[in-house]
Amino acid sequence: MFDLNVKYAESNLHVVLAHGAGAGLRHDFMQGMQEFLCEKGVNVWTFNFGYMQKAYAEEKKIPPSRLPILIEEYAQVITEIRRREPNAQLWIGGKSMGGRVACHLACQSDDIKGVAVLGYPFHPVGKPNNTRLDVLHQIKQPVIIIQGERDTFGNAQEIAGYSLPTNIGVNCLPDGDHSLKPRKVSGLSQTEHMHAAATRITHFIKGRAR
């Protein structure tokens, strides 16, 4: 079902990470985040949305499905995880588009503990006035957003100008782009930022676990 994959950490804490628009669960970023979070004691589930399954099968790029379809597919994944792990404490999230879909799904699901987003698409690239903030004002669960300072979908300066609810926490990583990758001149690395993201998400999850 949707190439559902899990990396277990022998814990009752589970997080689901959905991929971004252009790369599925096979991408190095998704595999790296799954590994780093698991090392810190969280079971990590990943999956491919239906359009990405088709893209892999046909070996060609396919645009994402409409948002309602993505939300429904994510909901089906959660149902399957609940079937396999009925006692799991469950957080959801994802990279960029996947994180946005998770926020919409959390608005419909009271049993989701919280949401973790890696690079929230606050607006389309080059269209800073076309913001996607409504769902962040609707969601009731705690949300952590890990954002690169230079993210073209919403940089640190732009985010500072938003009036976000108190349950939304944004952590900006120095000089990071939409994939948390800093420039060489910064002296930092994408791997360091991914480890930092995993650490902050783990603290977020464990701090709210029963």
Language model features: what each stretch is:
Residues 94-98, 102:
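Gly/Ala-rich beta-loop-alpha elbow adjacent to hydrolase catalytic centers
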Residues 101-105, 126:
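Hydrolases whose catalytic domains are alpha/beta-hydrolase-1, hotdog thioesterase
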Residues 152-158:
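Conserved alpha/beta-hydrolase "acid-adjacent" motif
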